[in-house]
Amino acid sequence: AHTIFLTMNDRGLSLNSAEMMKAYIIQQISESDRLDVNHQWQENINRIKNASSYDTSGVVSTEDVEFISTWLRAKYAQTLREGKLGAKDEDFELLGEKFHTWVRANARSVMGLAKSKDFRTLIMTEMTKVTNLYLRIKEYGKKLTPGYEEVFYNANRDLNYQMMLIIAAVCNDDTEE
């Protein structure tokens, strides 16, 4: 019953990795900060979902999962599966669709999340900064913008790792520009 509770929402639908990661992070945060962190998480995710193309097919948007996977891969993946048959999945692959499991296993050792304030900073500072950057890069990829022409050209040539590489290069204390 506990497993079902952790993996299904109040409508009986399965939770995605983003929702399960959020639940884990919120559990690690002090009671006094939970509402603020939850609000910031929701604001970031809503901005990501609202910026994605509108889909009327009835298919559930996975933009939040794609965003978090890109963010975590850019910032925390240290290993990559070898290119041989039967090779074991490493950080990069594990941070794909099931990143919530990787975060639980590596929060302290790889991500440096030991205390409530660390988890709070992850959402309030890092996730928010990456959300802002992600949305800007998406916009620059759609519209030719002076000073960001390369981003536009790369996006329109489907250079898939551009977003991840840009996010990897940015630190929490960098300016917006």
Language-model regions: role of each:
Residues A1-E177:
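Polyanionic (Asp/Glu-rich) segments that form extended negatively charged tracts
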